[in-house]
Amino acid sequence: MSLTYRDAGVDIDEGDRLVDLIKPHARPTLRPEVLGGIGGFGGLFALDVKKYREPVLVSGTDGVGTKLKVAFAADRHDTVGIDLVAMCVNDIAVVGAEPLFFLDYYATGKLSAEQGAQVVKGIAEGCRQAGCALIGGETAELPGFYERGEYDLAGFAVGCVDRPRIVDGTRVARGDVVIGIASSGLHSNGFSLARKALLERYPLDHRFDALGGRTLADALLEPTRIYAKDVLALLEQVPVRAFAHITGGGLPGNVPRTLPDGTRAVLEEQRWPRPAIFDLVEREGQVPRDEMYRTFNMGLGLVAVVAPGDEAAAHAALRARGLEAWTVGAIEAGGPGEATCEVVR
């Protein structure tokens, strides 16, 4: 009896069907600089170098982590792609880069074209929100590698910034103002802890008054906010000295990454409201507050550092973008040879 690749668990026809299903989602994301379409060996992007004095390419890669476990359990796959794009483009935007193009890696044990198309639909929506082109990706069917119905995602974003406009935190000084910009919820970090705290006690369809009657699935799968266009718009109006994308490690772990040695950011907890999902995780899981801050964004998905004289203009620019933001602290002198962030209660 002859043996085929399909017999071994890899269905090439299903992969081809997936490509056909995702093309209508990817096509609207394409920018004028993109040469060719989806399905080639490599994505082609003709960078318009005339827009820059000294163009610097900026790259970022990330995944969605165990938030995917919630998507599997809820059988919802059309928003985790937004999370994937957000985790990558937010990282490159905080140095001042405009996201240009994006690629994804989708790996699963048994390929379902319909499920994969839902994932890519979300990726395309994320690219639309970020203003970047989805120019390619890889679909890997790996029999026996994942549980049935499960998959993993990785994303890759490339952007560009003019060298004189790179935001690297070197101009941050004592007395500068720290502005926190609202997150949409947990974003894509801390889900192993959130799942342990909540999903061992409650089903995903459980509704909490504290969540405005939403189900746990709704709250946990709220897509990560994409800040790329907001960052670029703010930089057009205010000389922001530093940005931090608040991901794994929370405020204490991420704010210092953009500060010069010898400085510390002191943030006052009462200056911003905390979304109910964080209080729910803390209470139901009996998670210490310090652990919450080391794990989650605690309501601030992005932090900007500006000179005191630019504080009002920064808030006005953020309001104009429809973003909630608060002055949450200031930069003080710190210990020699290190940068730190402290949240004061």
Curated annotation (Swiss-Prot):
Keyword hit for DNA-binding: no
Coiled coil ranges: none
The entry's keywords: ATP-binding, Cytoplasm, Ligase, Nucleotide-binding, Purine biosynthesis
Paired cysteines (S-S): none
Pathway(s) served: Purine metabolism; IMP biosynthesis via de novo pathway; 5-amino-1-(5-phospho-D-ribosyl)imidazole from N(2)-formyl-N(1)-(5-phospho-D-ribosyl)glycinamide: step 2/2
Name of encoding gene: purM
Protein name (record): Phosphoribosylformylglycinamidine cyclo-ligase
Catalytic reactions of this protein: 2-formamido-N(1)-(5-O-phospho-beta-D-ribosyl)acetamidine + ATP = 5-amino-1-(5-phospho-beta-D-ribosyl)imidazole + ADP + phosphate + H(+)
Source species: Anaeromyxobacter dehalogenans (strain 2CP-1 / ATCC BAA-258)
